Regions:
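Extracytoplasmic/secreted cell-surface and envelope-processing proteins
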Residues: 1, 24-28, 167-168
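Short, glycine-/Ser/Thr-/acidic-enriched flexible segments
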Residues: 104, 127, 149, 162-165, ...
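Extracytoplasmic
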Residues: 178-184, 192, 198-204, 208-252
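Glycan-recognition surfaces
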Residues: 7-102, 123, 135
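Carbohydrate-binding surface patches
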Residues: 90-93, 98-100, 136-178, 207
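Short, well-ordered alpha-helical packing segments
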Residues: 1-7
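Surface beta-strand/loop "capping" patches
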Residues: 133-154, 223-242
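Catalytic cores of secreted or luminal carbohydrate-active enzymes
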Residues: 85-134, 208-226
């Protein structure tokens, strides 16, 4: 097989599986990443669809393995707000980042976005985790993940409005498992926000994202448990083999 041949070369080679959908847990033994969607296009409907497909695949990311959301379409004609959603969600979901535009003609605003060191650092966080959904009310989604260290006091948070109208967010800090006075930083605009003690409240316009780094005084116990976070050890998208249902922890 290709994998066996690569192993014989004794080089650090990254293998990506592309079958336009999450292939199954078997992919971890073969590849470092895998595509989870059809090919991306430089339009909002395509970006939104890929995010939708990856919202509940966080259990399969980690330990040096990643859900590949396809290349970046930054600098290819989408408006600023949609580009911020595109790049920000790719970063917090730990997707591989591959530039898909002509670097000689990319607009300055688009170039500054993909050069944002704080967003790149989020994507390259050593934990390599993918953000997961902790709140979905109306059209808005709230995603979070640990950064720096597991069960630490620092987390990344995305308030994501994919709809065509404004969306109100009220996110209790208990959902983010952070306690005390929580410091907030806007990673897209690279500025500090007012600290909060109870909840994060904001209104977002259509097709927009608020991407935050939140640092609390201490970590609190989880208050939400969702079946969509589960790791299914025998998941096989090919559907050729019937497996007994097993319950196991994520290997990472």
């Amino acid at each position: 097989s290709i994998r066996n041949s690569i192993d014989k070369v004794n080089k650090d080679v990254s293998v990506n599986i592309c079958r336009w959908a999450f292939p199954g847990t078997w992919a971890r033994s073969i590849a470092r990443s895998w595509r989870i969607s059809p090919d991306i296009r430089p339009r909002w409907s395509s970006v939104k669809r890929i995010i939708d497909l990856n919202l509940y695949l966080s259990a399969y990311c980690g330990g040096g393995h990643y859900n590949d959301m396809d290349m970046l379409e930054i600098g290819r004609g989408m408006p600023r707000n949609e580009e911020e959603v595109h790049f920000g969600m790719w970063c917090i979901m730990s997707s591989p980042l591959m530039i898909g535009c002509d670097m000689q003609t990319i607009p300055e605003a688009s170039l500054s976005l993909i050069k944002n060191e704080e967003l790149i650092a989020l994507n390259q966080d050593p934990l390599g985790l993918q953000a997961y959904v902790v709140q979905h009310e109306g059209e808005g989604y709230v995603l979070t993940k640990d950064i720096g260290r597991r069960r630490g006091t620092e987390r990344a948070v995305a308030l994501y409005n994919p709809s065509d109208s404004a969306c109100h967010f009220n996110v209790p800090l208990s959902l983010l498992e952070l306690g005390g006075r929580v410091r907030l930083r806007d990673l897209v605009r690279r500025c500090d926000l007012e600290p909060v003690s109870d909840s994060i409240v904001c209104d977002l316009p259509a097709r927009s994202l608020r991407l935050l780094r939140a640092e609390g005084l201490y970590r609190t116990d989880p208050v939400a448990y969702e079946a969509e976070w589960a790791y299914l050890p025998c998941f096989d998208a090919l559907g050729k083999v019937k497996h007994q249902v097993l319950y196991a922890a994520n290997p990472d």
